Amino acid sequence: VPVYASWDDHDYFSNDRAGIPNGYTEEDRQGVRRVYTQSWNNPAYGFNDQRGGIFYRTRVGPCDVIVVDNRYFRSGQKGSFLGDGQMAWLKEQLQACSGPFIIMACSTMWSDYVSNGKDSWGRWDPEGREQIFKLIETQRIPGVLLISGDRHGARGFRIPRPGGFNLYEFESATLGGRKGLPGKRPEWKDVQLYGISDTYAFSEFSIDATLNNPEVSF
């Protein structure tokens, strides 16, 4: 079974760390990336040159899979969640995908429901997130499924857009069952698909691309 990986904060120095954390150097950052590339046999590792990163795009069956890197390029300034180069790359990849579904993964949550301004798009780069979501919406890029992690537990959310379009996020779970925030909250009732916390869990997409209108279940 092919395994495709990404890192999050505890793989990248420590809790909520990104870019070059205080007390570390560029050499340390390169070392973290080097160990990662030696540990995971991914299809690519970012720019594959001195610019670094570990993002990539691949294909699993009929589906495109895009994994972004929201740790390496952050500078501590708003708008640096992916960095300019990776953002341009992501926009190109989204428009080049040809499968019925695009699984787009980010190690932190796409929505703000659980993160509440913590180590998230909502805190560091809401403008960049809006660029991505608006591109998907205006270019009518079909079948985008958002997956995420970071916060302990497994939750699914509908992300409504101003024009009535919806994106769907699947926080993929905590295999180790570490307790985190509540799986459900009353204020999420209109947007939440499911919620699990304080137990073992994993997530799985089942895709049937043989139909005239391909289907996915989660």
Q: What residue spans do the PLM features occupy?
A:
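Metal-dependent phosphoester/phosphodiester hydrolase catalytic core
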Residues: V1-F218
